[in-house]
């Protein structure tokens, strides 16, 4: 079978044509790539930043949020009050017995015409939503629906008490400060001192710093009886104190009349 022979110059011509076609396709592809690249390139502040479209939208949203937070001219007509003032408690704190154990500490509170005793985390009978959260030496912290309020022992008592025309309305606690004395969890008496600005003890047999072991028949080493003794001072005009002074127990009768200098009688007996 005869073999067809092509001229050599024709073969070279076809090879050059194929190379030219390939170059054309490469050029077209490069042009398309460059068009797409510059289409998705953002020129900002003289810098070329490549980022997808959704990233630009996110950046714009953050900028809009910043403008709304800092430069918005429209304010909420009905803003929500964060801290609303809670009415103050209408109670009278009459006494505090503080021990090293929070569970044995308690307070005496006047609610209406009655005096109540409360321990830590107890709710008030007159206000079931109010709880005792902390008992301090001279104050108590109450919580009412997340609002905390501190009530101080005898907050309205002036430094100097004016003497009334008659002492008939005054009680022993108007002239005597009784502070529980503790040794760890054990209470072993009440330390007695005159109220600031008063010279009440100069007209009685009491001396500043005296330690009372008993008041009437109440032992001041038991928390329950200490509570009753503090209540007695808040309601009575006279009482018998068992005082330990220089290691010697003494019985001293004390009255409002003696503390005000209106009564010259003094009663003391050494046990």
From Swiss-Prot:
The chain crosses the membrane at residues 18-38. The keyword Ribonucleoprotein does not apply. It comes from the Bacteria. GO terms for biological process: protein secretion by the type II secretion system. Induction: Silenced by the DNA-binding protein H-NS under standard growth conditions. One of its GO terms (cellular component) is plasma membrane. Residues 1-17 are cytoplasmic. It is found in: Cell inner membrane. It is a single-pass membrane protein. Keywords: Cell inner membrane, Cell membrane, Membrane, Protein transport, Transmembrane, Transmembrane helix, Transport. SUPFAM superfamilies: PDZ domain-like (SSF50156). Gene3D superfamilies: 2.30.30.830, 2.30.42.10. Residues 39-271 are periplasmic. Involved in a type II secretion system (T2SS, formerly general secretion pathway, GSP) for the export of proteins. Part of a cryptic operon that encodes proteins involved in type II secretion machinery in other organisms, but is not expressed in strain K12. Belongs to the GSP C family. This is Putative type II secretion system protein C.
């Amino acid at each position: 079978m005869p073999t067809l022979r092509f001229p050599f110059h024709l073969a070279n011509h076809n090879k050059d044509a194929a190379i030219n076609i390939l170059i054309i396709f490469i050029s077209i592809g490069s042009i398309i790539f460059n068009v797409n690249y510059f289409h998705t390139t953002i020129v900002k502040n003289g810098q070329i930043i490549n980022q997808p479209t959704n990233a630009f939208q996110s950046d714009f949203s953050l900028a809009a949020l910043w403008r709304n937070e800092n430069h918005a001219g429209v304010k909420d007509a009905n803003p929500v009050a964060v801290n609303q003032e809670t009415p103050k408690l209408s109670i009278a704190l009459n006494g505090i017995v503080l021990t090293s154990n929070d569970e044995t500490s308690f307070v005496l509170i006047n609610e209406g015409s009655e005096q109540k005793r409360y321990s830590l985390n107890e709710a008030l009978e007159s206000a079931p939503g109010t709880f005792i959260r902390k008992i301090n030496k001279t104050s108590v912290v109450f919580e009412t629906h997340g609002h905390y309020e501190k009530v101080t022992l005898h907050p309205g008592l002036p430094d100097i008490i004016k003497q009334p025309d008659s002492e008939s309305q005054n009680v022993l606690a108007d002239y005597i400060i009784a502070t529980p004395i503790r040794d760890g969890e054990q209470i072993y008496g009440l330390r007695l001192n005159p109220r600031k600005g008063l010279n009440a003890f100069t007209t009685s047999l009491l001396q500043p710093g005296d330690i009372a072991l008993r008041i009437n028949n109440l032992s001041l080493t038991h928390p329950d009886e200490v509570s009753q003794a503090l209540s007695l001072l808040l309601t009575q005009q006279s009482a018998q104190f068992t005082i330990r002074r220089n290691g010697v127990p003494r019985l001293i009768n004390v009255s409002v009349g003696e503390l005000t200098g209106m009564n010259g009688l003094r009663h003391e007996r050494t046990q």
